[in-house]
Amino acid sequence: MTLSVMPMEWIAAGGAAALGAAMGGASLVTPRWGASVVRLAPDPRWKGGWAEFRASYGGALLLAHGAVLLTLAMSFQAGSGAVMGASFAVALYWFGMAAGRIVSMVIDCEQETRTRYNAIGVGFELLMAAALGAPFLAHLGG
């Protein structure tokens, strides 16, 4: 399937998947970048913290989003069900992050979680969830 005949929902999911894969790749190669984005640092009391950034924010993001890109690239063989399934699963990942951040902003407010950074984070996570979920949502509506 060429880009000119690919549904807009698939293009949106592909763009979000490319962004997510790039973020994962950057965190895998440069864990300090991933740590700065999520505003965390390895606990100096325990060894191996950088491996967690490479794994959780690097490899996991890269390959989860890579799976969406692969199903889009192979949609002529895999079919639309594969595209919907892969993109919906990763959409739920982003929706879960937004939900967790919202819960923290409500419950953990004494920890100063109600910040502009977290509000922007919720918006970004919901945007990624919507873009990645678009193929599935379009299927429900169509």
Predicted features along the sequence, with ranges:
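Transmembrane helix-loop-helix
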Residues: T71-C109, T113-A119, G142
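Juxtamembrane helix-capping/reentrant segments at transmembrane boundaries
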Residues: A41-A55, R114-I120
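N-terminal signal-anchor transmembrane alpha helix
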Residues: W10-V29
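Cytosolic, membrane-interface loops and tails of multi-pass inner-membrane proteins
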Residues: T30-W50, S104, D108-C109
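Alpha-helical transmembrane segments of multipass membrane proteins
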Residues: G24-G25, V68-L72, I102, G133
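Core segments of alpha-helical transmembrane spans in multipass integral membrane proteins
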Residues: G49-A73, L92-G96
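Juxtamembrane boundary at the C-terminal end of a transmembrane helix
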Residues: L132-G142
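Short, strongly hydrophobic alpha-helical membrane anchors
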Residues: M1-P7, G141-G142
